[in-house]
Amino acid sequence: NYHVNTEKEYNEYYLNQLKEILGNPKYGNNGKFIEVWMDGARGSGAQKVTYTFDKWFEYIKKAEGDIAIFSAQPTSVRWIGNERGIAGDPVWHKVKKAKITDDVKNDYLNHGDPEGDMYSVGEADVSIRSGWFYHDNQQPKSIKDLMDIYFKFVGRGTPLLLNIPPNKEGNFA
């Protein structure tokens, strides 16, 4: 619950975290960031919150200039519509801004739109394991599977964000 009780408090808390981190020389590359990644997942059973994306994006751009923003909202970088390692064929790096809503179809995100009115790179995210977190009983994907993912993302012109979770000792295994 992030130690807040209302949407208003949550949105203020989130904005304050952005203000603390962005442009601060203690973080990033001497205070410079190239991308802010805003995951839209809330987890099962989580309360629905109406986020103040406009305020957050305004601050992010003020603090970091031409930074790329990954979000479920109409931004410069969009979710590709799945976490399985498959980008659309073809995939377009444009979308129609009005179509990027909470109800957007994953297939639309996966392919983009050749007639789109805004540039939005489809960024692919996938974990090297079957889940996002490390578990002793899970094995990493095989080289064959990773190569297949690579060709179906990067080979189709889509940046790949590969999650490699650390184990309990903090090592990447």
PLM region spans:
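Mature catalytic domains of secreted/periplasmic carbohydrate-active enzymes
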Residues: 1-173
